[in-house]
């Protein structure tokens, strides 16, 4: 039975789709077709500056790199929109440290 759950976990991670709600200023992933969702919240703190504030993944889904998909989507948004970013969220700080792409690094405000 545990093996079946493991297969299901792998299936979830291969079908993740990040949605961006610009009005609510959040990126989200619906998890396993349920009402559960992982979110990354941000705020505009200037005309071309965002603060990537918080990432949250429901406890039952942690450790499956779901937050990594949210962080990548958020940083890609910063690049595509030619924004600058404050990284208040510790997870996004970790993501950028582990993925030090020049297009990310040049947009981070310290």
Curated annotation (Swiss-Prot):
Against Gene3D superfamilies, the record matches this protein to:
3.40.630.30
Residue ranges of domain N-acetyltransferase in the record = 19-109
UniProt xrefs under Pfam families: Acetyltransf_CG
Q: Which InterPro entries match?
A: Acyl_CoA_acyltransferase, Gcn5-rel_NAT, GNAT_YJDJ
Question: Domain of life, per the record?
Answer: Eukaryota
Family to which this protein belongs: Belongs to the NATD1 family.
Name of the protein this chain belongs to: Protein NATD1
Q: Which species is the source of this protein?
A: Danio rerio (Zebrafish)
């Amino acid at each position: 039975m545990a093996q079946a759950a493991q297969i299901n976990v792998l299936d979830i991670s291969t079908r993740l789709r990040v949605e961006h709600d610009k009005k609510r200023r959040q990126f989200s992933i619906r998890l396993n077709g349920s009402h559960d969702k992982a979110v990354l919240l941000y705020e505009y703190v200037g005309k071309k500056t965002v603060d990537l504030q918080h990432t949250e993944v429901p406890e039952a889904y942690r450790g499956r790199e779901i937050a990594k998909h949210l962080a990548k989507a958020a940083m890609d948004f910063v690049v595509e929109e030619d924004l600058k970013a404050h990284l208040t969220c510790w997870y996004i700080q970790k993501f950028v440290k582990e993925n030090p792409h020049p297009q990310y690094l040049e947009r981070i405000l310290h």
